[in-house]
């Protein structure tokens, strides 16, 4: 009887084991990075397209200066209507050096002009609250005390410039793979935050945004979930 002894397979060295584990993890991470990089490219592409479109649109609106159908109210003491686009532009901000085309945000700024300044007359006790709300609404103003013949302050009078400063900011959130759109003073004295999928920031959405600015439609507000409404609603 002949016995044949099979040679044992050499056990991998400790360094070989580390190498195998390292290579496996590198492969997993590379596979995970691929959709992440694709998501980043989708977000950056959407932001650049939005900037180019808004830059041209605001240039045309600044020339045309169309009427705006919104009515802006602040409490029961100030109302601006009969508005029109006065000026506006689009801008962007990049991330730090070495980040390529990655954008920190895209923003559209514009001003609405009313026909005449507003005058708000309130009691001295209400003056501090009114001043705070005027500042929160980004309105420019100056105030003076109204004094009677006995040198007693009867009212505080605010002279408010007939200009509403508004903005729309597109800010990427790469972790959530979303684009947050912050509207400030667009259709009221208030800030609203919407959360968009990158693919949803397309030309039809931007068209709806301009229609919202002009007061022609509020369809833009229904294109994405409402992420946040500023806890201080300055218009009420």
Regions flagged by a language model, labelled:
Residues 2-236:
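A composition-biased, non-transmembrane "mature-region" signal
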């Amino acid at each position: 009887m002949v016995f044949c002894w099979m040679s044992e397979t050499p056990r991998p060295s400790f360094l070989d084991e580390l190498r195998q584990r390292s290579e496996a993890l590198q492969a997993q991470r590379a596979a995970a990075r691929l959709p992440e990089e694709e998501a980043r490219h989708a977000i950056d592409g959407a932001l650049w397209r939005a900037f180019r479109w808004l830059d041209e649109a605001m240039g045309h609106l600044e020339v045309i200066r169309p009427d705006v159908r919104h009515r802006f109210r602040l409490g029961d003491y100030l109302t601006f209507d009969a508005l029109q686009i006065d000026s506006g532009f689009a801008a962007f901000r990049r991330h730090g050096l070495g980040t390529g085309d990655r954008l920190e945000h895209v923003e559209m700024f514009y001003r609405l002009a009313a026909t005449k300044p507003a005058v708000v007359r309130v009691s001295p006790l209400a003056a501090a609250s009114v001043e705070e709300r005027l500042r929160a609404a980004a309105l420019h103003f100056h105030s003076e005390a109204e004094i009677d013949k006995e040198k007693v302050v009867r009212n505080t009078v605010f002279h408010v410039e007939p200009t509403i400063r508004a903005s729309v900011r597109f800010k990427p959130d790469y972790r959530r793979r979303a684009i947050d759109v912050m509207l400030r003073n667009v259709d009221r004295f208030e800030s609203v935050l919407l959360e968009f999928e990158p693919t949803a920031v397309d030309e039809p959405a931007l068209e709806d945004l301009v229609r919202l600015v002009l007061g022609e439609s509020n369809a833009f507000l229904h294109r994405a979930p409402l992420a946040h409404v500023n806890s201080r609603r300055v218009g009420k």
